[in-house]
Structures are given as structure tokens and as C-alpha cells.
């Protein structure tokens, strides 16, 4: 498989960095951040199978490395943890990555490690009046993982710019509120909640549609004109430079987890349910999602430049990358990203 060979070269390149680095002690612990939903499935498989621990052992780091997993509700809090040095690897959308890349170019230089997956995000509602985003009014409230900063918030602005004109890109922002995916679904399904709409990712987006009266207003792939990365992994340049073996081991483990998901979808679904304790979908429902061709687990970024260019045009980031690879470490530059 061409992509698999390319990713193998990624790992080889990372280990080349290891061999050229001067001998020094690397970190004794690594902290990785997950979010809610199957967008975190690669990390969940890594955690369950202890793939990172195995890769670290094989890398001969020279000192024990403890692996810690933490969970965040969105990219904003994750970015704070990266800035404070409390987080080694973040897992969040293209928006949070672009924000950090532009913000830290002159200091800690946060960059993308790889993409995690591409999945359609759905804006669902229980309001029968709302068939397009033009039907939203002040009476509506839209839940998403982070107002203004989450990938869902940015995609909503892109859709608004297309529907109402570029100068009206923020028209729907006052209707948005920050909630985790699980809490957003709970509010949407509660008839007495002021939150009547939810912009979210699988499995929550599909599970919501199983309930009577819920329908989809917008699909992120429609906004982007094709597949788009849901989550990326990112870290600081300093972490990569000072911990080359630990960094290379991460890439190796992440590649293994990605290949496992693509080859063993039912087992991956079981692992997700076992680790996450998520009650929003059954095993069979998860397998159906994982078999959906629109849901792809790939380390190659997709559709990132459309999001990042919009962010730059509207002042969300001060500098715009010329190509997607400007935001990512060189180990993945050979992948077919967009």
C-alpha cells in the first residue's frame, strides 16, 4: 500500500533524527490528550494496547518513560496545557492547531505531528423550522465544543460567509455555546433545553439522528467541498528536538494504531466502548460508522488549507501557511496531504 510505505518512511526519517542527535536523557513521562468521540479512537487504541509503551521499550530511550492519558472537552483547554508544558501531544482540530502554529512561531513553535482522521461533522437540530442555516434565529442555541475556536465553530463561520456574504461570517456566533460532545447531545435531546441544535462529530452526530424529530442542517464535507480532517496531533518543536527517541516512538505507535483500526474495525469498536465507557452508540452502530467510507483513519491531513486560509482572511491567525506542510513537522511531508 502506497500510503503505508510513505508512513514507514516517516518512521525511518524520525529514527534518523534520533541517530543524529547527541546522547542525552529524554523525558521521564509523556502526557497525551484525548477528546470525546471516535475522533480519539487512535489514541484510545494506543492506550488500550499499550502501543506507545511497547514502542518506547523498542526505542531504547535509556530511561523509563511513563505514559499518561488525560481527557479534554475541546482544543482551547488543550492549547493552554501545551503552552504551560503540561501536555506532550495534543489531539484537536485544524483550528486549534493553526491557532497555536501562528501564535508560537517565534517561541515554542507548535507544529502538527500528523493528522488522525477525516470525518464529517453534522449540525443537527430538533427545530422543525430550521432546514438551512438561514432559518436560524435568536431563539435558537447551537452547542459546539468551543465558541470561536473549535473546528465546528470555524466551519459554521465558513458556511455563514457562503450563505450571507463574507462580511456576515460571524452572524451565527451569538447563537453558539460551549459544551462537550456528550453534554451537547444530552441538551439537544432534552425538549426543555434552550439548546436545540448541536454541531458535533461521530458517534454523537449519528446517534442523535436515531431520535425522532432530529435532522441534519449542515454537513462539514459540504462546507469544505470534500473530506476534511477532524483531528490532528500536535506538539512543540522543543519537545521533538529534545526527545527524538520518544517522538519517533510516538509516530511508530500511532501508525500501528491507525493500521489496526483500518484492519480490525469491530475490535476497534469494542476497545472504544471498553475504554471510553461511551453509551451513545452500540458496538454494531460503531462498526457501521467505521465502515462508512466518509470516515477515514489516516495520518495525511485533508482539507486543512481551506480552513486555515479562512482563518487568516478573517484575522484569526496573523500569518498564513503557503501549503499544509508548513504547519507540520517534516516526518509527514511525504504524505498526500491537502
What are these model-derived regions, one by one?
Residues 311-338:
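Conserved C-terminal helix/tail region of periplasmic/extracytoplasmic solute-binding proteins
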Residues 1-11:
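Bacterial N-terminal signal peptides that target proteins for export
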Residues 240-318:
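Secondary-structure end/capping motifs
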Residues 21-25:
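Sec/Tat signal peptide C-region and signal peptidase I cleavage site
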Residues 182-274:
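Pocket-lining segment of extracytoplasmic ligand-binding domains
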Residues 41, 117-123, 214-215, 229-238, ...:
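Small-molecule pocket liners
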Residues 10-20:
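Bacterial N-terminal signal peptides
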Residues 26-169, 173-178, 192, 196-202, ...:
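Short, glycine-/small- and polar/acidic-enriched structural segments
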Amino acid at each position: 500500500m502506497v500510503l503505508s510505505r510513505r508512513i514507514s518512511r516517516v518512521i525511518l526519517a524520525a529514527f534518523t533524527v534520533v541517530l543524529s542527535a547527541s546522547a542525552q536523557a529524554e523525558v521521564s513521562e509523556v502526557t497525551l490528550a484525548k477528546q470525546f468521540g471516535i475522533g480519539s479512537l487512535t489514541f484510545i487504541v494506543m492506550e488500550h494496547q499499550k502501543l506507545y509503551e511497547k514502542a518506547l521499550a523498542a526505542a531504547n530511550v535509556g530511561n523509563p518513560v511513563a505514559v499518561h492519558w488525560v481527557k479534554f472537552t475541546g482544543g482551547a483547554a488543550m492549547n493552554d496545557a501545551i503552552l504551560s508544558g503540561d501536555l506532550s501531544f495534543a489531539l484537536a482540530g485544524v483550528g486549534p492547531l493553526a491557532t497555536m502554529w501562528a501564535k508560537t512561531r517565534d517561541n515554542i513553535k507548535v507544529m502538527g505531528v500528523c493528522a488522525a482522521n477525516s470525518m464529517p461533522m453534522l449540525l443537527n437540530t430538533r427545530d422543525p423550522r430550521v432546514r438551512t442555516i438561514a432559518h436560524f434565529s435568536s431563539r435558537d442555541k447551537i452547542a459546539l465544543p468551543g465558541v470561536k475556536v473549535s473546528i465546528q465553530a470555524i466551519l459554521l463561520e465558513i458556511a455563514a460567509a457562503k450563505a450571507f456574504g463574507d462580511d456576515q461570517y460571524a452572524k451565527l456566533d451569538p447563537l453558539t455555546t460551549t459544551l462537550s460532545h456528550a453534554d451537547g447531545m444530552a441538551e439537544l435531546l432534552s425538549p426543555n433545553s434552550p439548546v436545540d441544535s448541536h454541531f458535533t462529530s461521530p458517534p454523537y452526530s449519528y446517534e442523535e439522528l436515531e431520535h425522532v424529530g432530529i435532522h441534519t442542517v449542515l454537513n462539514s464535507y459540504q462546507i469544505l467541498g470534500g473530506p476534511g480532517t477532524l483531528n490532528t496531533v500536535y506538539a512543540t518543536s522543543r519537545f521533538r528536538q529534545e526527545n527524538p527517541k520518544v517522538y519517533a516512538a510516538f509516530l511508530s505507535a500511532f501508525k500501528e494504531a491507525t493500521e489496526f483500526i483500518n484492519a480490525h474495525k469491530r475490535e476497534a469498536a469494542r476497545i472504544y466502548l471498553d475504554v471510553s465507557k461511551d453509551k451513545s452508540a452500540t458496538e454494531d452502530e460503531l462498526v457501521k460508522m467505521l465502515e462508512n467510507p466518509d470516515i477515514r483513519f489516516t495520518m495525511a491531513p485533508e482539507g486543512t488549507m481551506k480552513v486555515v486560509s479562512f482563518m487568516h482572511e478573517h484575522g484569526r491567525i496573523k500569518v498564513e501557511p503557503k501549503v499544509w506542510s508548513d504547519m507540520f513537522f517534516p516526518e509527514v511531508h511525504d504524505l498526500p496531504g491537502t
